[in-house]
């Protein structure tokens, strides 16, 4: 019984059985209750605790402490549990046995890189779509936060037993693409000394000037020799492909890769758009009025109907969304879809659910995560513009300044619905004040200890972990034990910020152990046991960093 999740289930089952025994003895009435346990803030209250007696006191007519004593009396400490106790004002506490904790070190060493994996998903197919920035310009730090959220959740869901595909949706069919093409051609003409005006609805950033210069360097005046419409379209297609390459490069520098880059255009050329519209029409969710085509989402509880085809015959962005989600659920048969969008998409969530219902798809299969934006600071001062371009600071500039690992950790460090400040100066500090440095330094320190042991010719493969018993040793093991539970929590809540908190707590537990316990000493048997603990902590910390998409440095 080496998994903390197994121990957790045993505790919950023992509480359920205790309730039933108390009912059979006439001490409490029949009750229907969800049993939950959690880690107390202080380990002297045990490793798990439940407030069940406090919640049931009124229903049973008993004082919480009295009820706690009754239930605890029916619980026998099982495998892995050394003690069951009660504490005011009505908690039941469970304490792990030292034997279980010491054996866990061997379990971690045996499972190695698979430690922390659980079979929550059972191979269920999940698609996560994130970033999906328009291919009309560089990506910014807001896109970066969405990218890190998506890739980290993918890592965690895979560790939790799901089959996961990561997808970037290319918005290559809307009016913004036409504006991009017209802008690029105007800049191309200007680069060749021709007079041309950038369209008012175009893209006015310096990057378009640079992109046009690239086109001139590669193609000369080739596109001035063609009919305007053909030249503008063909050059625009090349420019858009180049923009996608730059976006992909920026994301790769953040350690974000996609399994699929999905073109919006393919929904129309591949027939999914027509098929999805036919389904809505057959189900009476399409209405024609004001020379436009509407999706009757109010029939499904939405606050208003939504235009899907404008009066000029062009589909709206929502029309593409309908076809895209038809493709995800019906054609590609994903069991669950997770969309990670910026908070400015809040208004789209309810109509997406309505649209799925209209297509005959259970809307609960779609989860939309909305994340807040990031405020960049430098030593407390707001950073608004790039020093290099004088425009909005790009993701690539931030990565270049502080590194991908710092970006990933800070982007993950707050819950998705929380706005966050990202202090560039803090992210570069080489001190415990910087959580990225603090966590990665713990891993480097571990590697240094193991390297020293190797230099001294110390083998610890036969080390006896039963010799471990110091408070700092057991606290470190307790924290290491939590990784499968953290994976389960993040996979269930889709809130990866729990990983950053856990990483800091784990690093802190290791640093405290290092301070309190001399690893390599004249006592070779104890040294071997502690080296086993150090190696196991390396595995758990590296796994945690891997789940966050970060590196595990061997030296710093």
Curated annotation (Swiss-Prot):
Its main location: cytoplasm. Its EC number is 6.1.1.19. It holds the Pfam family DALR_1. InterPro entries: aa-tRNA-synth_I_CS, Arg-tRNA-ligase, Arg-tRNA-synth_N, Arg-tRNA-synth_N_sf, ArgRS_core, DALR_anticod-bd, Rossmann-like_a/b/a_fold, tRNAsynth_Ia_anticodon-bd. GO terms for cellular component: cytoplasm. A motif ('HIGH' region) lies at residues 133-143. It is found in: Cytoplasm. SMART domains: Arg_tRNA_synt_N, DALR_1. GO terms for molecular function: arginine-tRNA ligase activity; ATP binding. GO terms for biological process: arginyl-tRNA aminoacylation. It comes from the Bacteria. It catalyses: tRNA(Arg) + L-arginine + ATP = L-arginyl-tRNA(Arg) + AMP + diphosphate. SUPFAM superfamilies: Anticodon-binding domain of a subclass of class I aminoacyl-tRNA synthetases, Arginyl-tRNA synthetase (ArgRS), N-terminal 'additional' domain, Nucleotidylyl transferase. Keywords: Aminoacyl-tRNA synthetase, ATP-binding, Cytoplasm, Ligase, Nucleotide-binding, Protein biosynthesis. Belongs to the class-I aminoacyl-tRNA synthetase family. PANTHER family: ARGININE--TRNA LIGASE, CYTOPLASMIC, ARGINYL-TRNA SYNTHETASE. HAMAP family: Arg_tRNA_synth (MF_00123). Monomer. NCBIfam families: argS. This is Arginine--tRNA ligase. It comes from Dehalococcoides mccartyi (strain ATCC BAA-2266 / KCTC 15142 / 195). The gene is argS.
